[in-house]
């Protein structure tokens, strides 16, 4: 095994993990990084593993919220305990918001990938779009907390998440931007976005897990995949913790500037 190849895969894992929580598109950065590192990773096995690593990190960060929602939601279903009503409704809204992207992703994933096959240029353009969206909401300060989310909010956020099926569009950006535009507090928008990420990522992992075992290069690249997976878990965990602080301070404009700079640079030099 070439040591340099191993290092490149670890760098990809760190990059994917770091960019997964923040609104700059992890998949887009993977495309760009593969281009500039001279790697040609075919199929979806590697990206699937990286997403699974990020999923584990998100579960660790939000384990208390998940436990509270599960306990209170079950309590409301079984005993109609009013204290659990808000959490039960929150769960229902998460399910509703999952449906649009889930259905379209399952039915048209191959068609979407084929349509946007010029990965590097598409990524550059979508980074510019993301930068513009983040710039437009830079000064928004919502007032809605978890218990004040409504059905309309869940539906709009769910359909907005479909935009993230386009390569290079950030999933967190595609959900946080409309959530804040609908008046959700930044911490509520962030929590809803990443709790929504869990069923989406879990469903995608389950549906595509056979791709990993049918990857003809799995034996050859087992160690690079493994180290990249571990790197993805660690990087996602710390990046998400950091992004929580950024959201609390309302400094999304920095991500907007970053997306503009990288998008323009890629269009010029790639």
Curated annotation (Swiss-Prot):
Superkingdom classification of source = Bacteria
Any idea where this protein resides? Cell membrane
Segments spanning the bilayer are: 41-61, 88-108, 117-137, 192-212, 218-238, 250-270
Membrane-protein topology:
Multi-pass membrane protein
Keywords in UniProt for this one?
Antibiotic resistance, Cell membrane, Cell shape, Cell wall biogenesis/degradation, Hydrolase, Membrane, Peptidoglycan synthesis, Transmembrane, Transmembrane helix
Q: Give one GO biological process term.
A: regulation of cell shape
PANTHER family in the cross-refs: UNDECAPRENYL-DIPHOSPHATASE
Additional observations? Bacitracin is thought to be involved in the inhibition of peptidoglycan synthesis by sequestering undecaprenyl diphosphate, thereby reducing the pool of lipid carrier available.
Q: What is this protein's record name?
A: Undecaprenyl-diphosphatase 1
